[in-house]
Amino acid sequence: MTNHVHLIIDPLDQPENLSVLMKKLSGKQTRYTNSLEGRSDTLWESRFKSSPVESDAYLLQCSRYVELNPVKANMVKQAENWKWSSYAVKVGISSKEWLDFDVCYIGLSKSESGRQSTYRQFVEGQASDKKDEQIHDALERCQLTGTGKFTDEIEKRMGRRIENRGPGRPRKGR
C-alpha cells in the first residue's frame, strides 16, 4: 500500500507495548526518511489505528484481509507479488527469518507443507465481504474485531461497557 501499512502484532500480555512500539517506529522512520530526503516534516498524518482481534475466530480472517489488500487495490495481480506481504513466506514461495507465525497459522496443519497449502486455499478461497467490512470498520473505529462473546469477555476484564457503534454522536432522544 502506498499510503498505509497493516501490521498484525501480538503485544502478549502488555497491550501498552503496542503504543510504545508504534511511537518508536514512527520516530525512527520519520527521522530516516527526513534525512534521506532532506526535509523536516512529519511522515504519518495521524495516530495509528488498532483493533484487538479475537484470535481463534478472526485472526485468519484478518490475515486474509491484509494479504489481499494490495490485490483489491489493483497494485498487484496476486498476493505473493506484493513485496511487503508475509503471504509469499506463508505459502512457501520465499523465506524471511524475522517473521513469526501466529498460533492460528501454525494450527492449520502439523506439517509445514500442509500449512502452506491450507493457507493458500484459505486466502484464495471466497472471502466474505461482510467479514471484510466488519474488519475494516473495526479498524477504522479502533474497536474490537470478534464475536459478541469476545466483546463480553473484554468488557468483563476491563470493567467497562464496550459497544460497537457507528460513527458520530448518538442522536438526542425526543
Region roles according to the model:
Residues 1, 10-174:
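Short Pro-Cys-Gly-centered "Cys-loop" motif that presents a nucleophilic cysteine in a tight turn
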Residues 4:
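Glycine/serine-rich anion-binding loops at beta->alpha junctions
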